[in-house]
C-alpha cells in the first residue's frame, strides 16, 4: 500500500468512526463530518447496542493503530489488574512505545511513530527497542538515537512542527524536544489520555 492509499484509507476510516485519526483527516473531517459514501450525510438509522459497542471498540483500536488481537490482549491483561478494567486498559495502551513517540511530538502520526520504532531509530534508556508494543515504565527515558537525529523527519520534529497538529503533551511526560528526548515521570491518569472513547462500552463488548 502506497502512502497516498494509506492516507486515503485513514481519511475514510476517520469519517466512518467519527474521529480524526491524522492531521489530514482532521482537515477533511471538519469539512465533511459525516460517514463516507453516497448516503453518509443522511444516515440516521438506529444502531443496536452491539453495534454501538463494536464501533467504540473500533474507535479505540484505530486511535492506537493496533490489531484486534492486541486490543483483546490489553483487555485480558486489564481484567487481571486491580481497579476498573477500562481505566487499566487505557493506561496500559497509553504506555506503548509507539504511542509515546507520538505523544512526545517525535512523529506526526501513529503510523510514522511505529515506523520509527520498527526501523530502530528509538532508544529506551539508551538501548534500541524495535517493538512498538513495548510498555515504557515510569522513570524510563525514550530518545531518538544520535545518528538518526540528523535525518530530515527528526529535524522537523525537533523544531516543534508537529506540536501544531498534536494534542498537548500529557502531564506524565517530560519532553525536551530539541534533544528529541522524553521521560515518563509517572503512570498516566485516565483524564489526561487524549483519546475519544467510551471505554466502558469497550469493556462491555469484550465481556459479553
UniProtKB/Swiss-Prot annotation:
InterPro entries: Ribosomal_uS4, Ribosomal_uS4_bac-type, Ribosomal_uS4_CS, Ribosomal_uS4_N, S4_RNA-bd, S4_RNA-bd_sf
SMART domains linked: Ribosomal_S4, S4
Domain named S4 RNA-binding: residues: 95-161
Keyword Ribosomal protein included in the entry's annotation: yes
GO biological process: ribosomal small subunit biogenesis; translation
Subunit structure as annotated in this protein's UniProt entry: Part of the 30S ribosomal subunit. Contacts protein S5. The interaction surface between S4 and S5 is involved in control of translational fidelity.
Descriptive protein name: Small ribosomal subunit protein uS4
UniProt organism field: Bifidobacterium longum (strain NCC 2705)
